[in-house]
Amino acid sequence: MRPIPVLCLFLLCATAMPALAQRVVSADEFARMVTGKTLRFDRDGSAFGAEQYFEDKRVIWAFESGQCQRGIWFANRAGEICFVYDTSPEPQCWSFLEGTDGRFRARLADDPAASDLVTREIGSEPLDCPLPDLGV
């Protein structure tokens, strides 16, 4: 066997391994994982935002800038976890993947793995978002 094809085969297998090491989380598993919790996400190694999950599938998303959005989540027929927010009525559907390192990745439908949101922390502390329609 020539060295170049062997190297190409090795590189192909090495790049495919991380994808094989991730498991898609079902909607039921997702509900058990997030209900009553706040997940903090990183993108490209930097803090990106956090989402608080309530018993009735309501959510509050907060960008690191502090901008908060309220919404709901549901599973679509493809098994993706979809979110609809008050400020954006179009569903945003994600696959949640569990890695061998125990961290979860959220991948927007049809986006490359490079744009994944990665859980930095799963806790129970509520987000600091004001209630809607409250004056100052």
Question: Predicted segment positions?
Answer:
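Lipid interaction determinants
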Residues: M17-I72, A78-V136
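Bacterial N-terminal signal peptides
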Residues: V6-T15
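Positively charged n-region of N-terminal signal peptides that target proteins for export
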Residues: M1-P5
